[in-house]
Every structure is written in C-alpha cells, then in structure tokens.
Amino acid sequence: MNKKPVMLMILDGFGITNHEDGNAVKMANKPNFDKLLREYPHTQLKASGLNVGLPEGQMGNSEVGHLNIGSGRVIYQELTRITKDINDGVFFENTEINYAIDEAIKNNSSLHLLGLLSDGGVHSHIDHLKAILKLAKDKGLNRVYVHAFLDGRDVPPSSAKEYIINIENYMKELSVGQIATLAGRYYAMDRDKRWERVELAYNALVYGTGELSNSAVEAIEKSYKDNTTDEFVLPTVILKDGKPTGTIKDEDSIIFFNFRPDRARQITRALNDKDFDGFERKRLKLNFITMTQYDKTIENVRIAYKPQSYKNTLGEYVSSLGLNQLRIAETEKYAHVTFFFNGGVETPNKGEDRALIPSPKVATYDLKPEMSAFEVKDEVINRIESNKYDMIILNFANPDMVGHTGVFDAAKTAIEVVDKCVGEISDKILEKEGTVFITADHGNSEQMIDYSTGKPMTAHTTNEVPFVYVSKDAKDKRLKSEGILADIAPTMLTEMGVKIPEEMTGRNLIEGK
C-alpha cells in the first residue's frame, strides 16, 4: 500500500527578516524553497519570547523550539510560568501558597520566605517574593520574615545592597515583612554536599546564630568593607532589640521561592528530611512549600508549581493511533527531534523509528557547511520509498550550526545545500501524494552581523520563521497568520485527518479545514 506520509521538515536556524545585511537566507541561491513559496500557501510563525514560553523578548533556541513543536502547546519555563500567573492574578489563588499563609494565621505562627534575592531569573526572581508578600498582606498575616540568600553570580557580584533596599522599601510600603537573615548562596545554596556550609545557613535560620548585625544594609556594607562579595557573605542574623528578628520554629510556615531545583535541595532536606544526616540538627514540624518540585524524594513538602505534564505530545498521540513515524537528523540535532520533540522523554514511542546520521568530524562547521545534509536526504528518501511511515520528522542542522560560526559565506553555502535537499525531498513526498510542512525552530543565519557594530553575530535571533504547506491539495488553500510553533502539531494532525487531542492548545493553521 502506498502511504501518503505527512512530513515536517525543520530547517534549524532559518529565520526571516527583510534586512539584507548579513542575511545568508536572503542572499543564498535557493530556487527550490523560492519555488515552493511561489506555488504553495505559506505564513510566518513566532518562535521567541512568550510565544514559546520564554521571557518576553528572549530569542528562541532549539530545545525550546522542538519542545513547543512536538507538544502542540506553549511550554512555559518556570520563570515565565510563575511571572505570567502573577500578571494574570492566578498566582494569588495558588492552593499551596495560600495554604502556607492560612496555616500561619491558624497556628498564630510565622511565615518565612526563603530564596535568592535578585532579578537574575536563573534560580528565582524578586518579583515572585513581592507577590507572596502582597498576598500575606492581603490575607492579614503580620509575622512575615524574609531570609535573603545573596546572589552575585547571575547578577553583578556586589549588587545585593540594591536588592535589599528594594525589598525593604517594598515591605515598608506594604507594612508587612522584615529581613531576618542574610546568607551568600555559597552557603545557603550549596549543591555539592558541603554540609559544613549549609549548616552555617541552617544555624542562622533556626537557631539565630552566626554573624550578627543590626540591619541588612549594615551587614552587607560590612561584608563589602571586608572585600566579601554577595555570593560569599557569611550567614548573618539580623537583630531587633538585641534579639534575632525571626527564627524558624515548630508550626511555622515556609515558602522557598526558588524555582530552579538543583541549589535548593540541600537546605530543603536539612529542614525537612526525617533521616537527614548531613549534620546534627533539631527536627522541626513545619508547613513547608517549595515553589517547584526540587526532588521527588524530599519528604514533608508541598509543591506550589507541580511539574508540567506533556501528555499526548505529537509523537505519543500518533503512536496511540497505531501509526508509524520516523525521526531523522544528524548528530547535532538528533536529541532535538527525539528527546525534546517527545517532551523530554528518552524512550521512543511504539511505532517510532529513529535514524541518526553522524555529523562530520570537523573543528568548526564553516569548514564543511554541507555537514551531513546530503546523507540525511538520501536516507529519508529511502525511508519514504519503504511506504512504512505515516509521519516523518526531519531536521537539517546546517542553517543553525553554520550560522553559529559567524562566517557569512559558509552560512550561505549551508542554505544552498539544504535547498537542494528540500527540493528532492519535496518532490519525493509529492510523488507519494503526501504533504510536507517546512518550518524552523528559531532564527539564526538570516542575521549574521550585529546591525549596531557591523561585527559577525553568532547568536540566535527573535525573528519569525517560515511555515510552508506543500501538498497537491494545498494550492487553493490558505494559512492563518499570527501562528506560533505550538500550532504546527495541530495543523499536521488536521492534515492527517485525525482529531486534535485536548491537551494541545495550539490551533490548526489551515483555513477552512
């Protein structure tokens, strides 16, 4: 039986811009791609920032791109997910955050807010702390203590004073909250089982012992005088009327507002694990909330933002329908069309074949801009001829990997090589009465120079990417505008004539279908 395969061809790093300077995509001789654009419906997709779950204005990347494409929904990074909820007001209804505050009110106890005090956005964000403080204020809780871990890595090394002043001003405005302790992340956020460091942070939090200071600003100024930058500030207890401002006690509530797990695990274990043996410590009965899941094995904690489920990704769903699929790429992008495309799952789905074509062994890809594109093309044509596959996902690495070298002529050659492959593969799919959707995961080689300096640019871009619908039946159809990467999977399923699963929040882009 001759199958009518539906293929997605991802031209990695192939973005669109009208700028001609440094635009390898525009300057390349690509008769096949240009012909497909003339003859078939096409549109542009947003592939950066909030449209792919990244912070506003942040360029896309291959991991995030393939995650969004393969899952058929916008996958929000934890930072963006929480910030979006705060902006939408949803955060203030979070069950676990509210539980922590309500328990403190019920028990007439204190709420302690632990976390990295900066806007670095890698482990935490000061705006998330502010949102919790606001909710505590709105619910009428007064005993709220901030235990500020100081950054100096994801932000400048001596910037903690600004963040301390910022949060103290905010708390003054709210009339809720006081800084109870400070500790450099070197101590409070160790991840290498150097328990002697964590113990110093623990002692400040629970026993109120360590360095002593009458104010947070005074403590940080003293550290700067001693040439100690933020990361290495010794755990310091802030005194009020000569006593620790607020130590952690039985029945207290804690919200650890770091969203990245790796450096939050150890201090969380010290405060919660029943059989903790990193150092001697008294065990407390706490209502402990972690912003995200730090580790499945940590005991006695509740999680404000549980791991996102990627149920019914494109690959999983197609497999559940009993259909066969192929994933094919060269080494550089193989993980992207398999692991990331499947929502971070390593194991192939039932009926999912994988073809890995080795990438060439060269120092940099400008030395061989064709990479292994021709080998990928030959292999996929053989696989199409087998009539086995209902769906094929293919990635050409060249526009991205050669784009990263910053060598314009090499990037131009890379595009021209890929264009030859696009032509041959499209012809073969059309011969089988199938469909090819051509797209990219993010931009890169369409901007090879920094417009402000004129120097080579090697990074990804925030530009839109193409989406071309190639099929014998497509010529009289139209594609909707304003699409995003998450719309690709629903569009492919529509073309395959199957229902879109409810977990996919992307939309079908084919007008009238």
From Swiss-Prot:
GO terms for molecular function: manganese ion binding; phosphoglycerate mutase activity. The keyword Isomerase applies. Substrate binds at H123, R153, D154, R185, R191, R260, P261, D262, R263, K333. Pathway: Carbohydrate degradation; glycolysis; pyruvate from D-glyceraldehyde 3-phosphate: step 3/5. Keywords: Glycolysis, Isomerase, Manganese, Metal-binding. Its EC number is 5.4.2.12. Its cofactor is Mn(2+). One of its GO terms (biological process) is glycolytic process. It catalyses: (2R)-2-phosphoglycerate = (2R)-3-phosphoglycerate. The active site is at S62. One of its GO terms (cellular component) is cytosol. Binds 2 manganese ions per subunit. Mn(2+) 1 binds at D400, H404, H460. Mn(2+) 2 binds at D12, S62, D441, H442. Belongs to the BPG-independent phosphoglycerate mutase family. PANTHER family: 2,3-BISPHOSPHOGLYCERATE-INDEPENDENT PHOSPHOGLYCERATE MUTASE. Monomer. Catalyzes the interconversion of 2-phosphoglycerate and 3-phosphoglycerate. HAMAP family: GpmI. This is 2,3-bisphosphoglycerate-independent phosphoglycerate mutase. The lineage of its organism: Bacteria, Bacillati, Bacillota, Clostridia, Eubacteriales. The gene is gpmI.
